[in-house]
Amino acid sequence: MPACVLAYSGGLDTSVILGWLQDEGWDVHCVYVDIGQPGEDKQAILKKAQDCGAKSARIVDVTEELCRDFAFPVLKAGAKYESIYLLGTSIARPLISKVMLQVAREVGATAYAHGATGKGNDQCRFQLAAEALDPTVQMIAPWRIKAFRDRFPGRTELIAYCEEKGIPVKATSAKPYSSDENCLHVSYEAGDLEDLSVAGVDVVDFTMGVSPQEAPDKLEEVTVGFEKGVPVSINGQKLDAKDLVEKANELAGRNGVGRIDMVENRFVGMKSRGVYEAPGMTLLYEAHRMLEELTLDRDLMHLRDQLSPIVAEMVYYGLWYTPKLDALFAFTDKAQEPVTGEVTLGMYKGNLSARRRSSPNSLYDAEIASMEGGGSYDQDDATGFLRITGLPSRVQGTVTPRSY
C-alpha cells in the first residue's frame, strides 16, 4: 500500500481524514507537530491515532525552533501583515510542512495530507512550502476533492462517519467560532465572527490573558534585552527563545496586551474577519521598535520600513522557502547588527509605553538634540543646508508658479 503522512491534530476533521485515507488505500503515518499548543493532552491524541489504525503516530516538538528560527526573524524585520497582524499562524505553517516532509522521508511516504480547506490561507502555506522543499511530493488536500466534499458536506456527516468507524470524537454542538493556537498567538475566525455587527472581543473566549478592563489598575514595568535585534532576556534573565516567548506571554497577558480585531485580505482573494491575541509578541515587537529608534540610522530605518510589508506579505502568503525572502532576511540580519540593548516598557490595561531605553550603539546625542543654548550643533549651518535642499523647488517655482 502507498504511504502518506498526515498532519494530525486529533480533532474531528483530521480524524475523519485519517479514516478516509485508509479507505482510499493509504498507509497513514500521523504526525502531531507540537508548536506550543496549550491545554491539549498530546499523549491521548497520539493514542487515538494509533487506535484508529495509523501505521505510525508521533509527536514532534519544534516549539523552540518556531520561536528562534521563524518568529524572531520576522520580528527583526518588523513585519506585520496589513500593518496589524503579527503572523502567528502564517509563521508556523512552513515549519509544519518541513517537519512533515522530514517524517515522510524517514518512513518512505510519497504523499503529504492536511486538513486545510480550499478557501483559506493555510492550504497555500502548507503546499508552497512542501513544493519548495520537495517538488516530488504528492499533496492530498481532501477538502479540495469534490468526492470528499460530496461524502462529507457538513459536520453531521463527519460525526456519523466517526460513529460508524468507532472513532472517538466530541460530538458537541459547534462553537460560535473556530480557533488555532500555538505559543505565539491564538487566532479566532468563522462562525459568529463572520457577522461584522458582532463585537469580536465580546464573542471570543480569550485564553492567553485578561481583558484590558480586568487587568490590574497599576502600571507594571518589564525590561526586554536584545542582541542584534533578537530578544534574549526579560527583566535581566537570559532565556531561550521558547521560554522568553512564554514569559512575555505571561507578563503581557496579565496586563491585557495584544488583542486585535481586523478584516484582512486573504491570499486567495477574499476578505475575512479575524480576531487575534498575541500578548508576548506584541510586547516584543514594541520593545524592538523602541530600541531601533536609538540604534538604526535614519535612511536604513526608512528602507527597512519599506521592506517590512513585503516580508509580511510573503510570510502571509506562504512564500517562506524562496530566494526573495532569503535575500530580505539577509538584509535584515545586516541591518539589525547594531540593535543591541535594553528597553523598559510600562504595561497598563492593554497599553504599552516607553519608560527607559539604552544601547551601547545608541545614535542619540543629547548635546546635539538639546533645545537649550550651546551644544555641538551650529544652527547657522542650517541656512546653507536649506538653500541647497530648496534649489530644485526655487527653480521649479520660477518656471511654473503654483497658485495659493
Feature locations, PLM:
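Nucleotide-activated chemistry modules centered on ATP-dependent adenylation/adenylyltransferase
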Residues: 1-7, 12-404
